[in-house]
Swiss-Prot record:
This is Glutamate racemase. The keyword Repeat does not apply. Substrate binds at residues 12-13, 44-45, 76-77, 186-187. One of its GO terms (molecular function) is glutamate racemase activity. It catalyses: L-glutamate = D-glutamate. The keyword Cell wall biogenesis/degradation applies. Provides the (R)-glutamate required for cell wall biosynthesis. InterPro entries: Asp/Glu/hydantoin_racemase, Asp/Glu_race, Asp/Glu_racemase_AS_1, Asp/Glu_racemase_AS_2, Glu_race. Its EC number is 5.1.1.3. Pfam families: Asp_Glu_race. Pathway: Cell wall biogenesis; peptidoglycan biosynthesis. Gene3D superfamilies: 3.40.50.1860. Keywords: Cell shape, Cell wall biogenesis/degradation, Isomerase, Peptidoglycan synthesis.
Length: 271
């Protein structure tokens, strides 16, 4: 069994998973975390599922090898690509971002019409559609929004260009009358103001980040490995497989004082 003092490992293809890290810091402020942003290989959306799986498992191997007590796949595309493999491969709990968001969306919808937006890889994997299959009386409309990630990774979350892009992407969801919209990519909460503007106030946005943090709390509590309140102050280590300075410039926008620095990392399984 893992030590309660061990850190929680979190990874994503880039900065998007920091929305999950931020939610975990807010909900579990005593926990040590190690975050890896795979900016050297991301974004994952345009890659094939085998490519995503290889990159994700290399990072998972590295984090588990460093003794994390839980592994959070803070990326919808990676969750769709390698969740089953990761749970078979590692002896620590693996938390993903898809099912927590699906549960919240089902509990939230009033008319049963739920939208999902994500990367092309996530949408074509049918991971969300399959996760919703058990929910009765729901109609799912899934739309790929591949260029959203590019804008977020460049730090562009408002303006005429991204607004026009959002209007085009979201039009099928407006047509289908969804009342609940799952932000099926951890980058997308950074565009939530824009998305809400386009969809209107009658549509509820569901962030996988908030729901995933709640799931981490549940898992650590069930396994009795929550870090005690009287432990030394929490440490948060942020690493990037690409340029750490570029990562830090973007990450600082939504982590603020929680971000004290970014280290370069190259997991041994990566090519």
């Amino acid at each position: 069994m893992s030590s309660p003092l061990a850190p929680v490992g979190i990874f994503d293809s880039g900065v998007g998973g920091l929305t999950v890290a931020r939610a975990i810091i807010d909900q579990l402020p005593d926990e040590d975390i190690v975050y890896v942003g795979d900016t050297g290989n991301g974004p994952y959306g345009p890659l094939t599922i085998p490519e995503v799986r290889a990159h994700a498992l290399a990072i998972g191997d590295d984090l588990v090898g460093r003794g994390v007590k839980a592994l959070v796949i803070a990326c919808n595309t990676a969750s769709a690509a390698c969740l089953r493999d990761a749970r078979e491969r590692y002896d620590v709990p693996v938390v993903e971002v898809i099912l927590p968001a699906v549960r919240r969306a089902v509990a939230t919808t009033r008319n049963g019409r739920i939208g999902v937006i994500g990367t092309r890889a996530t949408i074509t994997s049918h991971a969300y559609q399959d996760a919703f299959a058990a929910a009765r009386d729901t109609e799912i409309t899934a739309v790929a929004c591949p260029r959203f990630v590019d804008f977020v990774e460049r730090g562009v979350t408002s303006g005429r260009q991204v607004l026009g892009l959002a209007e085009g992407y979201l039009e099928p969801l407006q047509r289908s009358g969804v009342d609940t919209l799952v932000l099926g990519c951890t980058h997308y909460p950074l565009l939530s103001g824009l998305i809400q503007l386009v969809m209107g106030d009658n549509v509820t946005l569901v962030s996988s980040a908030e729901e995933t943090a709640k799931e981490v709390l549940r898992v650590l509590t069930e396994r009795d490995i929550l870090r005690p309140h009287d432990a030394p102050p929490a440490t948060r280590l942020f690493e990037a497989t690409g340029d750490p300075e570029a990562f830090m410039a973007l990450a600082a926008r939504f982590l603020g004082p929680a971000l004290t620095g970014v280290q370069p990392v190259r997991p041994s399984g990566m090519h």
